[in-house]
């Protein structure tokens, strides 16, 4: 039991590591909270610190979720689903004890959790993400629609035997929680999308015809 408790705490602390914030401060002498959206996640890192830093932060944030999900396998823990460990990493990422309980928008770390538990489901979500990004050139919209399609996937796929061969109650609950976290963390982005002032990326068709900011 003590091992399980320690690993659950470790999962939160692993997720709480604010790679974007630390990389910005150490290598660029910039506090991401003072630039752009003020967020320490992948998108703001790309915009403020550049491609290399953005890719690094994305990879680290993704791995946080995957490693936390795999911790019980590494330590041969039974009786607690790997998804619980992954969820704690996402909570740590979103409400980091190392950053005054601030954090990212949970997209990359949630993707890491799904990668560690159901890689095929992540591929499905990645396809959705890329299609939406190509059409509208908005990372935020792609993330939110990806979260919605995750909810649709856990409802529909088990009934048709596609990707998810059977209903998994805990997986469904975790996906629901992750999707809600992602959507709520993008509230301000959704308002900007509604007002046609959301930031765009130089990729895709931009069917909204909004000017890049």
Swiss-Prot record:
Keyword 4Fe-4S: no
Transmembrane feature ranges: 4-24, 48-68, 71-91, 113-133, 144-164, 165-185
Subcellular location field: Cell membrane
SMART domains from the UniProt entry: G3P_acyltransf
Keywords: Cell membrane, Lipid biosynthesis, Lipid metabolism, Membrane, Phospholipid biosynthesis, Phospholipid metabolism, Transferase, Transmembrane, Transmembrane helix
Key word Heme present: no
Pathway the protein takes part in: Lipid metabolism; phospholipid metabolism
A GO term for molecular function: acyl-phosphate glycerol-3-phosphate acyltransferase activity
InterPro entries associated with the record: G3P_acylTferase_PlsY
Membrane topology: Multi-pass membrane protein
Catalytic activity: an acyl phosphate + sn-glycerol 3-phosphate = a 1-acyl-sn-glycero-3-phosphate + phosphate
One of the record's GO cellular component terms: plasma membrane
Biological process annotations from GO: phospholipid biosynthetic process
EC number: 2.3.1.275
Self-association state and partner proteins as the record states: Probably interacts with PlsX.
UniProt function note: Catalyzes the transfer of an acyl group from acyl-phosphate (acyl-PO(4)) to glycerol-3-phosphate (G3P) to form lysophosphatidic acid (LPA). This enzyme utilizes acyl-phosphate as fatty acyl donor, but not acyl-CoA or acyl-ACP.
Family recorded in the similarity comment: Belongs to the PlsY family.
Name used for this protein in its record: Glycerol-3-phosphate acyltransferase
């Amino acid at each position: 039991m003590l091992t399980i408790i320690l690993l659950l705490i470790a999962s939160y602390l692993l997720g709480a590591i604010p790679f974007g914030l630390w990389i910005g401060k150490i290598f660029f002498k910039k506090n991401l909270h003072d630039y752009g959206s003020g967020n320490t996640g992948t998108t703001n890192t790309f915009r403020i610190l550049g491609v290399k830093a953005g890719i690094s932060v994305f990879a680290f944030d993704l791995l946080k979720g995957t490693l936390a999900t795999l911790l019980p396998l590494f330590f041969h823990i039974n009786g607690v689903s790997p998804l619980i460990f992954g969820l704690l990493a996402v909570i740590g990422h979103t409400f980091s004890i190392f950053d005054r309980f601030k954090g990212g928008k949970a997209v990359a770390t949630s993707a890491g959790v799904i990668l560690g538990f159901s890689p095929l489901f992540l591929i499905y979500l990645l396809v959705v993400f890329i299609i939406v990004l190509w059409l509208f050139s908005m990372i935020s919209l792609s993330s939110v629609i990806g979260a919605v399609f995750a909810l649709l996937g856990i409802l529909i796929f088990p009934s048709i035997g596609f990707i998810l061969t059977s209903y998994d109650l805990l997986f469904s609950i975790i996906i629901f929680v992750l999707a809600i976290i992602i959507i709520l963390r993008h509230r301000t982005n959704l308002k900007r999308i509604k007002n046609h002032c959301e930031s765009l990326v130089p990729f895709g068709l931009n069917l909204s015809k909004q000017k890049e900011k």
